[in-house]
Amino acid sequence: MAVLVSLACLHMVPAHAQSTAPRNAHAALPEVVVSGSRQEQAADELPLSYDVINANTLSNQQSRNLREALENLPNTSVKRSPARFSVGGATASAGRDGNVGINIRGLGGNRVLLMTDGVRMPRSYAFRTTTFDREYLSLELLKRIEVVRGPASALYGSDGMAGLVNFITHEPADFLAVGKGETPKTLGGRIAAGWSGDDNGHTLAGTVAGQASDTLQWMLTATTRGAHAMDNMGTNHEPNLNRTRPNPQDDRDNAVLGKIVLRPHATQRHVFTLEHVQKKSDVDLLSSRNPLPLRGTPAQIAGAIVDEYSSRSMERNRLTWDARFGLGTDWADHLRTVVAYQDAQSRQVGTSVRNTLPLRVRDNSYGESTWQAGVQADKILRSGGWAHKITYGLDHVRSDISNLYTGLAPLPPEVFPLKRFPDTRETTSALYVQDESVHGNWSLTPGLRFDHFSLDVTSQAGFYPPAKQPGQSLSGSALSPKIGVLYRATEQWSVFGQYAAGFRAPDAGQVNGYYENAAEQVIIIPNPDLRPEKSRGVELGVRGRLDRLSLDAAVFGSHYSNLIMDTVLIRGTGTAADPRIFQTINTERARITGFELKGQYDWGRVAGGRLVTPFSYGKARGVNRATGKPINSVDPAQLALGVQYDTAAWGLRLDMRHHAAKTAKD
């Protein structure tokens, strides 16, 4: 059992943000989301489970990273590995990948689709002790975070098997808006600064936005953050394997977001976006050093680590043109086109100084360059008392994926430079359609998407040889249906249900990954016969919007087939004559079930301020249906409970989180 209590959110509130009238659950404007249906829609009209975290919440919670932003959501978590990258020594198997990915309802990593303004973010990549995470973002650039729990492939395709998270960035209008009767702004912005004691981190961000004319708005945001190692309760400061204090660490994050919004006509809107995110971390791995004086066999003394240090860097650049047209034709009321180019590069460099053996260096990199294009139309039709909003379109995504391993003193029989998998182009083309039908208090939303995907090797250079066989290409297709139902029982209560299918195509590293280590008698071989993972999910839920209480509750169950398991031992005893052979394989079926609830209670005005209690609880359990064993990626139950007090000038928030123990049956 673990309990975490934080008193982290003493914040200043602008005077105009405080209402003097009593507020209930409906006082604010209805929350609008785009991720649940690919259209702007009132969140409570969605027949599925969702979460929206807006910029005010991120600021008031003083969230510094993705883990902190999502930590109060039910059945949602972010894995953190604070030790970062290392080369050898005792920390070789320790985590070194930062906030590696989001887990939704028991599955995470690349099974959760991450997007920024609807553009797919890079995948994570892991191979043995090298891991590249997915946190290519800065929270200071975000207007809100939208989370959809459950399969999302019917609208977004591969990787949306467990759910999706869409990071939506600010626009100029967010800083130029004025109240009723006030003079319109031609210039606006904000400045934000922060400090955190647990990692001695500091943040500075600034935004300036302007209205150049009636048809043109612009915005520029820049942010920087510096931090050191996360503090802990360790007491041993020794610079060797016995150390329990954090290793010295220096983190630097920088990000820039620029936008131009052009409205040449009342029925047109064009948004041009430039986003740049850069992160770097340097670690002095004192905990890898061998204690002095050196002891052991002559070979152990020769290879003893006397110094070790590493660096990790990542950079993402994005250009997007997002255009919307009002048509009013027989086939479409509106048309949206998106063209985006994104380049992401990650690099990890580690250096081990050994006692008498040669210097060991590992310089590993991973990159994705992606073109994404989409066309989407919608049309409202009426028939027999039903109103239909038809949304249909096509998506095309092409990613060139590369990796490179180089350095000094490779393990035999490897010779640097080399590639763990060949240069690969992943391509996906898809058609989708959705019909949101409304009749009285009922809403019915069926949808269907067809994806064709291919994984094509573009170059064998650096991979074959030394690999025993050339990399193989792979292709396939998937059909992802869904249907959702929403019934508005009263003005305060509604119930909903959804069935949705999802899938995830195997990636380049899983299909063609190769590794050989003669000293350990280990070989990892490719598997060009991998099949896509598939999921089928059902959920039932209820929503209540009362004067004081806001409540969402849902039960869910998902069935998975062809789950891909990385580096599974398939044969071998670990001798020179019979080395251990590992391979990424498809496994049997699995099932994850659970329930969740969230909401808040508004106590009203207390001593001149407003007192609110937010809460959430989630519990899930997963079983491998072939072996009967639990699925370890499913988190134990978590309860989050808070108290938030806001006045016109300042606010105070107390959060408590309780994590149940992970038992053998879990």
Tell me the role of every PLM-derived stretch.
Residues 67, 71-120:
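Extracytoplasmic beta-strand/coil segments of soluble accessory domains associated
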Residues 102, 120-151:
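Short acidic/polar hinge/loop motifs at secondary-structure boundaries
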Residues 173, 187, 194-203, 207-310, ...:
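Periplasmic-side early beta-strands and strand-to-turn transitions of outer-membrane beta-barrels
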Residues 387-389, 395-397, 422-558, 609-616, ...:
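Structural signature of Gram-negative outer-membrane beta-barrels, strongest in the C-terminal barrel
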